[in-house]
């Protein structure tokens, strides 16, 4: 009975380790940017990042009408 419990606990720990590693990899890009994509002036695709509180240091506004769409 004790052996089955230990096997069950080890499998559960291994499962949690794998799930947490997959979750980190899936959210890595979102955590790096922490903003939403937006379209800069003169670009045909979403090349900028919309920041809630303005452009962070090292970034500049790339849309005349919206100061929160920024490019690095």
From Swiss-Prot:
InterPro entries in UniProt: Myo_ane_neurotoxin_sf
Keyword DNA-binding: no
Prosegment residue ranges: 22-32
Domain of life: Eukaryota
Signal peptide (residue range): 1-21
Listed GO MF terms: toxin activity
Gene3D superfamilies assigned to the protein according to its UniProt record, in alphabetical order: Anthopleurin-A
A GO CC annotation given for this chain: extracellular region
Cysteine disulfide partners in this protein: 38-69, 40-62, 55-70
Subcellular location: Secreted; Nematocyst
Alphabetical keyword list: Cleavage on pair of basic residues, Disulfide bond, Nematocyst, Neurotoxin, Secreted, Signal, Toxin
Family stated for the protein in its record: Belongs to the sea anemone sodium channel inhibitory toxin family. Type I subfamily.
Descriptive protein name: U-actitoxin-Avd1f
Organism: Anemonia viridis
Lineage: Eukaryota, Metazoa, Cnidaria, Anthozoa, Hexacorallia
């Amino acid at each position: 009975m004790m052996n089955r419990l230990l096997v069950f606990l080890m499998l559960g720990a291994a499962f949690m380790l794998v799930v947490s590693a997959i979750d980190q990899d899936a959210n890595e890009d979102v955590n790096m940017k922490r903003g939403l994509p937006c379209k800069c002036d003169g670009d045909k695709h979403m090349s900028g990042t919309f920041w809630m509180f303005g452009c962070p240091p090292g970034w500049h506004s790339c849309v005349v009408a919206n100061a929160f769409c920024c490019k690095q």
